[in-house]
Amino acid sequence: SIIALEKCNPNDTVTVSDSVIKQISNWKGSASINLEAGEKISVLDLIYSMMLVSANDSLFALAEFICGSLDKFAVMMQEKAKSIGAADTTVTTADGRFTAEQYSNAYDLAIICRYCMTNRMFRTIAATDKYTIPATNKNGSRDLQNTNLLINSGNRRYRYETAIGIKSGYTARSKSCLACSALPPASKFGEEVLAIILGAENTKQMKYVFYDAITLLDFTFNNYEALSGKKPEQQNSEAEKTITTVGKLCEILN
């Protein structure tokens, strides 16, 4: 999404090709917004559908629009990741499907998300609960709702009042994953907090990917204190407290 926002005018019109439809039809069970060959849709609408509901047909259409193919887009993603400091990330498939060579980690994903959240339009999209794609030449309007339950207003159990993004995802190998960001509650003084959850196992009773995210965010806002502006001895004292609280956090999550 960040590449599309940086490379394209959001109002540019993309015409969906036959090859995009063929690619998505070959991926059974993949999330999509059911694009059709010849459909004309804006870059912005494609980005919203990627971010809110993980629409892979939208990804395929954007990748082809920007650089001609998914393979070329994966190369572009790799170059972008390295350029912003994600040194331990290797991208081989633009759509995230498993290959033995493709990998990343929580630290690199945090670097990537921090960079993305400096883009105003990206922040707006990441924090969006509901979005309607206007009718196109091939389809009527489409109503989307964010699958990130920290944002989703239809889910009271996991909704986080100050959450402002970012992206949830799932594959059979990776399990449930979430990159999330939240502002401090009104009663707290602090900064925006970013958390990465990888490989969460969900059950019918509990979506642990969101439970863990809420646990991390609450713990951070309740225990974090900025050290800037304090004397060195105060900073050392606060650092010792931080080490202690991190240990407690590990106990909570284990």
Name each model-derived stretch.
Residues 86-87, 98-103, 107-108, 113-254:
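Domain-terminus/edge residues, biased toward the C-terminal soluble/receptor-binding domains
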Residues 1-107, 116-120:
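Active-site-adjacent loops and short helices of periplasmic peptidoglycan-processing enzymes
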